[in-house]
Amino acid sequence: MSSADDQTTTTSSELRADIRRLGDLLGETLVRQEGPELLDLVEKVRRLTREDGEAAAELLRGTELETAAKLVRAFSTYFHLANVTEQVHRGRELRTKRAAEGGLLARTADRLKDADPEHLRATVKNLNVRPVFTAHPTEAARRSVLNKLRRIAALLETPVIEADRRRYDTRLAENIDLVWQTDELRVVRPEPADEARNAIYYLDELHAGAVGDVLEDLTAELERVGVQLPDDTRPLTFGTWIGGDRDGNPNVTPEVTWDVLILQHEHGINDALELIDELRGFLSNSIRYTGATEELLTSLGTDLERLPEISPRYKRLNAEEPYRLKATCIRQKLENTKQRLAKGTAHQPGRDYLGTGELLHDLKLIQTSLREHRGGLFADGRMDRTIRTLAAFGLQLATMDVREHADAHHYALGQLFDRLGEESWRYADMPRDYRGKLLAKELRSRRPLAPSPAPLDAAGAKTLGVFHTVKRALAVFGPEVIESYIISMCQGADDVFAAAVLAREAGLLDLHAGWAKIGIVPLLETTDELKAADTILEDMLSDPSYRRLVALRGDVQEVMLGYSDSSKFGGITTSQWEIHRAQRRLRDVAHRYGVRLRLFHGRGGTVGRGGGPSHDAILAQPWGTLEGEIKVTEQGEVISDKYLVPSLARENLELTVAATLQASALHTAPRQSDEALARWDAAMDVVSDAAHSAYRRLVEDPDLPTYFLASTPVDQLADLHLGSRPSRRPGSGVSLDGLRAIPWVFGWTQSRQIVPGWFGVGSGLKALREAGLDTVLDEMHEQWHFFRNFLSNVEMTLAKTDLRIARHYVDTLVPDHLKHVFATIEAEHELTVREVLRITGGEKLLDTHPVLQQTFAIRDAYLDPISYLQVALLKRQRDAAAADTPPDPLLARALLLTVNGVAAGLRNTG
C-alpha cells in the first residue's frame, strides 16, 4: 500500500521513508490476508479520490458491505501506522534538538537565573504538576490495537544496521498482520475497571522510565543554577477521575470506586517492588567499609523483630550489609501491604505501609546514612531518583478525584434539613443566598445534622455513601489516595458549603478539632459561572468556617475551570476569553485572602474543548495565576498521543513541568503596560461579544438539532462503546442541551465541519476591524501570548476543517429545508479564514507551519475515502430505517469502522 507522501516533498525524508516502509508492509498484509484485489481497490480509490472526488464517492456508493468494511479497515490501519511513525519521529527530532541545544529543562533553568532568588525558591518548593487521567469516551482505539502499535513504535525507534533489517521488517510485518486480525471495535461497553486498566497501562510505563528521567534532570538543572529541590517536594504527581467521577455516570458506584482503588494499588505496589528490587541489587555496601547511622541500624533492628518472614539465612548473609537488609525489610512491608489490601485486614504499624509517607521515610533513612558515610554520589543519584519516582506515583499510582453534580448534594441535604423542620422554607425552595447562610451556619455547628445512619432515600444515601467511601479509603490506603472532592455545575458558594457539610457528616472534617482530610473544589464550567468566578470565591473565603477549612488544607484552594461546556454553550471565543479573565479574578481574590490558588484546567483533546499545545497554553496564562502548581486533565486519545511512545512521554512531561516552572517563577507581573492591557481587554470584549452573538444565533436556530443529527454520525457514538459514561445527561431527551460536550464535538468532527473549534471567531474579528481597531489586532497578535495562542489553535482547527467533504454529507443526508444551516456555517467559515489570514499575513492556512500544512494534505488522500464511505453507509442505514427494514449488523459494523477511521485520520474524536 503505497504512500501519498510519494507525491510530495517534506522536510523529513526519514519520516517519509518510514511511512512508505510501513505502507508497503501493510500492502503485503492486505495481499497475504485478503488477496491482491483489495490492495488494487485501495490504490484505485486513493488515486480516484485525488483526481476526482465525486467519481470516488460514486464508486464507493455501490460498494458491497463486506468490501466497504475491508476498505475502511485498510485506510484506518494506514492512519494508525502513520500516526505512530509520526510520534516516533517527533521524539527523534526532540532528541536531536536536545543534543544540539540542551534539554528543555536546561534551557528553562538558564532563564531562571533572572528570577528573584527568594521567589524562585518558594516556587520550586511548591512545584507540583499533576496530569489527571480521565475516562471520557474519546479514545476510539482499543488497547489491544494500541499495544501492537507500541511494539511497532519500539521497533521503529531501534537503530538498525542493514544486516538486521530483514529481521526487523519481519517483526514489523508480524505486528501489522496482528493489527489487521484484531477487531478494533469493542464488543461491549467498558466498565470503569476496564477504563482504569487502560490508564494504569500508561502509568506503569511512565513509572518504569520517563518520570524518573524527568525528575533526575530537573533536580540536576536546578542545582546547576544554584537552587536545591527540597526532599519533600513532589514536582510531578498523577491524578485520575476513573472510578471517582460520578457526575452523570450511574456506573460509578461506591463499590466501583473501591474496586478501582484496589486495582491501582495492586499495580502501584508491584511497580514499587520492582524499584526496591533494583535497589537491593545495588546496595551491597559493607559496614566494614562504610558504616551506617544509628537511626538506620535502630530501625533495622526494629524491622527484623517485627518481620519474622525474613529468613534467618537471609539475615545472616546480609549481616554486614545493613543497607541491603533494610531494603529487604522495605520489600517485605510492601508484600505485607499488598496482602493486607487483598484480604481486607487491618493495618499493622511496622509490618505494612499505610500510604506512601511511611515507605518514603524508610527509604530516606537509607539515603541519609549513605550521605553521611561517603555514599553521597549514589544517595543523590540513583537513590534520589527512586525516592522521587515513588513520591510521584505513591502506592496508589494516581490520586483519585471524586466528582459529583451539585444538585445531588442539595437533594440529600434537603431531606436532612426538612426533617428537622427548623426553617420556614423547604430546603429546595430556599434562595441561594439564604441556603448559603444556612449551610455556613451548619458548618460551624458542633452537633451532627443527622443520626447515623442518616434517614435518606436511596439516591440521597448513595450520595452520602460516597463520602463514607472516601473516609474508608483514607483509613485503609493512606492520605494520598483521595485529596479533592469536585462539585460539577457549581453556581455559588452554597454548592461548595453543601459538599463540606456532607463531608463533615461522614467524618471527613472537623473544624473544631482542627482537621480536614479532603479539599472541596468548585468546577466552574459555563460562561455565567466563569463571569461570576470572583464572586463565588469571595463568598467562599469570606465565610470564617470555610476559610478555616482552607487553612486546614495548607491555605490552598483548588478551583477547576471547565473548557468543554463553556465552549459548547458560549462558543470558543467567549469560552477562552472568560476562562482567561476568570483566572485573573480568582488570582486577585485568593491573594486578598492570603490563599494559594491551584487551578485545575479541564481541557479536552480538541481545540473546541480547550485542547492545543500544553506548553504554549501554560505560558499564555495570566501573570500570577501559577504559583508552582497546576492540574490538567488528560483525556481520551490525548493520552495515547502523549504517552504511547516512551521518548515522547518524557518530552511531554518535561514540556509541562518546564512551562509551569517558567510561568510561576518569571511571570509574576504583567508583561504589558496597564494601558496596553486595558486596550486589549476592551478589544477582546468586542471580539467575544460579536463571536458569542454569532454562535448563539447558530445554536438557537430551531433547525439546528435536526440538522446536527442529520449531517453527522453522532447517533452512532453510543454503539462504539467508547466509555462507561452515557453520551447524554439523564432525562435530556434529544435536545442539544442534554448532549454532552464530547459527542457535540465528536459529531461535528466526524463530518469535518468542526464547528466548535472556530465558529464565531470570524464575526468577532470582523467586528473589531470594523470598529477601526486593525492595529490593535496586529498588536495583540505580536505582543499578547494569550491572543497569539488562541489564534494559532483556531487556525489549526480551520485547517482540519474540510467543508468540501462536509458538503457531501449535507447534500446526501440533510433534507433541503435544513440546508440553510450549512449555508450559515459556510459563510462563517469563509469569514473566519479570511480574518485569520489578515492577521497572520499568510496566503493559506498554516503557511507558517509548512510541515503541518503538508501533513494535512497528505492525510486527505486517505481520509476522504473513509468519509465518502461513511456518508454512503449512513444513507443506506437511514433509508433502511425509513422503510422499516430490519437492521443489518454488517452495515452497522461497517459504519462504526468509518467512525474509528475518521478518528484515526484526524487524530481526534471529541
From Swiss-Prot:
The keyword Lyase applies. It is an enzyme of class 4 (lyase). It holds the Pfam family PEPcase. The active site is at residues 136, 568. Keywords: Carbon dioxide fixation, Lyase, Magnesium. NCBIfam families: PRK00009.1 (NF000584). HAMAP family: PEPcase_type1 (MF_00595). This is Phosphoenolpyruvate carboxylase. It comes from Streptomyces avermitilis (strain ATCC 31267 / DSM 46492 / JCM 5070 / NBRC 14893 / NCIMB 12804 / NRRL 8165 / MA-4680). The lineage of its organism: Bacteria, Bacillati, Actinomycetota, Actinomycetes, Kitasatosporales. The gene is ppc.
